[in-house]
């Protein structure tokens, strides 16, 4: 006899099914840890009880201001308490939160505001000039709210009212808008623009919920954890830590700007246990420690991603007392989807080997359903040889809904039933992936593939090099040749030929760059090198 599991009394009901959403995390922490610090910002401290109350008032105020389900509320602000409040208050009003990259120019901000059809814009005074210029480019202006902040640099008021005035119009007793379907949109995140105009990735409540839990599990956080905001909240909603910290009732420490000495001071003053950031952040901390002589009083866990971390930087960070966890992800997958899950037996490896192992992007997270490295045409997985290269692909609950107003790009991203990252990797015998390049960044010279990351790793090994980026430049005979852009720790401390000699002793001859360009390397706010700008620069110079 077959069991009848489709009987009416066995179907979903309120008692046994609710759409997954990270919004519930806030209220649990307010119930369990009402008087513990939820947010620390300078001399200001906000308890979990008051944090929840302010989020409820924000949701109410937005509804009373005309925000309806599915409306976009944008923010142009650094890592401050108002942004944390908006991550709950906006979706509790039924809205979609859109945190805008604060390093963008006015034209790019205007593009995002118009493309996302933002109904409200919250602005930090330090960015009021950019916001004013962006708003002037729009056919219609959203409701503008000034976030007043004593710690901000001077900036004029451009809004219709202040953030506190907005909150005063709301009530914590008003009803909130819960998602009826966990696939409803919770946020709108624009890609970092390494290839031109950004695309708007739509996140859903289910993905945000699962990724938040995956983060606290893999980052080993609990109610006693103190999380420092060195990672921009506008990047993948701070890799979902805007919600994840609430899941365990930990403490947020807000930071307007990444300054190495200030980070060390905050770690000591507030007992920071965790933070995230691109490898450039690790590099800044290593350099800052060298200048100031600062050290950690206790270990601090760091989750790093954004680009392959150079082995020398990883080793130097560990020597300072940081516990580095290398992760990997994309805007389109709610942030982090894989990590170099560490094996305790690797602790005994020689330093250089440990760093090489840690630089791998590793294996899928506990909430990532499937990951593979495969031929982009046939979808055949590459062998685990550590040599055969393929494209990194994912599928499962972490995938975005799609790109806003861009069906063709959405279909291309999900072609073949997988999300195509465009990253090229090998798979080692233990199943750990190792990204070698972006598909568009691989250098093909005389029919041979040259990994720009491999060349960059060697450049980073030189003690005078602070940062490096390698691109392909056109060559009449070989088709393409490597060109290295290099930032030095001390300007003028190294000659190009000296650096090339260093490379020749560590690389195959055909992989050694033909040219070295010294100077600043332009990056996105999340630490990714904008290689398309470097290519344009070389092309403009006739190379």
Task: Label each region the model flagged.
Residues 34, 145-146, 159-161, 168-190, ...:
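Conserved pre-ATP/AMP-binding loop-to-beta segment of ANL
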Residues 47-50, 186-210:
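Conserved AMP-binding A3 loop
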Residues 364-393, 429-430, 492-496, 530:
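Conserved beta-loop-beta connector loops within the AMP-binding
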Residues 104, 121-123, 275, 396, ...:
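AMP-binding/adenylate-forming catalytic core of the ANL superfamily
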Residues 209-226, 234-273, 288-289:
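Conserved AMP-binding/adenylation subdomain of ANL enzymes
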């Amino acid at each position: 006899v077959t069991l009848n599991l489709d009987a009416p009394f066995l179907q979903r009901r309120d008692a046994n099914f609710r759409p997954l959403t990270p919004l519930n995390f806030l209220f649990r922490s307010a119930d369990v840890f009402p008087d513990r610090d939820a947010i620390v910002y300078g001399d200001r401290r906000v308890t979990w009880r008051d944090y929840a109350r302010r989020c409820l008032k924000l949701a109410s105020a937005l509804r009373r201001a005309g925000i309806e389900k599915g409306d976009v509320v944008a923010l142009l602000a650094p890592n401050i308490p108002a942004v944390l409040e908006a991550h709950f208050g906006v979706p509790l009003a039924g809205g979609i939160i859109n945190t805008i990259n604060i390093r963008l120019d006015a034209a790019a901000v205007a593009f995002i505001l118009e493309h996302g059809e933002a109904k409200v814009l919250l602005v930090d005074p330090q960015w009021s000039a950019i916001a004013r210029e962006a708003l002037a480019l729009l056919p219609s202006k959203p409701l503008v709210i000034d976030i007043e902040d004593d710690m901000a640099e001077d900036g004029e008021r451009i809004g219709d009212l202040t953030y506190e005035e907005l909150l005063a119009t709301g009530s914590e007793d008003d009803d909130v808008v819960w998602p009826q379907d966990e696939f409803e949109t919770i946020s709108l995140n624009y890609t970092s623009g390494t290839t031109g105009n950004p695309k708007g990735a739509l996140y859903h409540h289910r993905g945000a919920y699962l990724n938040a839990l995956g983060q606290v599990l893999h980052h080993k956080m609990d109610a006693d954890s103190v999380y420092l905001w060195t990672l921009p909240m506008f990047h993948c909603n701070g890799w979902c830590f805007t919600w994840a910290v609430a899941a365990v009732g930990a403490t947020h420490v807000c930071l307007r700007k990444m300054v190495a000495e200030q980070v060390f001071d905050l770690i000591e003053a507030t007992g920071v246990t965790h933070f995230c950031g691109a490898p450039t952040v690790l590099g800044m901390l290593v350099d800052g420690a060298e200048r100031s002589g600062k050290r950690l009083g206790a270990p601090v866990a760091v989750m790093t991603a954004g680009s392959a971390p150079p082995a020398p930087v990883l080793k130097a960070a560990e020597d300072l007392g940081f516990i580095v966890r290398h992760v990997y992800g994309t805007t389109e997958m709610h942030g982090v989807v894989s990590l170099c899950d560490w094996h305790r037996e690797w602790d005994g490896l020689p330093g250089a080997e440990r760093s090489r192992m840690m630089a791998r992007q590793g294996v899928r997270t506990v909430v990532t359903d499937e990951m593979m490295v495969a031929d982009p045409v046939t979808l055949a997985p590459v062998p685990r040889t550590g040599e055969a290269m393929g494209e990194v692909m994912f599928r499962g609950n972490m995938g975005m809904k799609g790109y806003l107003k861009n069906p063709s790009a959405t279909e291309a991203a999900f072609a073949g039933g997988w999300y195509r990252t465009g990253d090229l990797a090998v798979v080692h015998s233990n199943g750990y992936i190792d990204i070698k390049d972006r598909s568009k960044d691989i250098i093909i010279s005389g029919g041979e593939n040259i990994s720009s990351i491999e060349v960059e790793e060697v450049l980073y090994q030189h003690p005078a090099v602070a940062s490096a980026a390698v691109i392909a430049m056109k060559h009449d005979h070989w088709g393409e040749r490597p060109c290295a852009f290099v930032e030095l720790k001390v300007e003028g401390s190294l000659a190009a030929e000296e650096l090339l000699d260093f490379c020749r002793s560590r690389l195959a001859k055909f992989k050694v760059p033909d040219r070295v360009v010294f100077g600043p390397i332009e990056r996105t706010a999340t630490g990714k090198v904008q290689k398309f700008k470097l290519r344009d620069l070389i092309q403009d110079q006739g190379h």
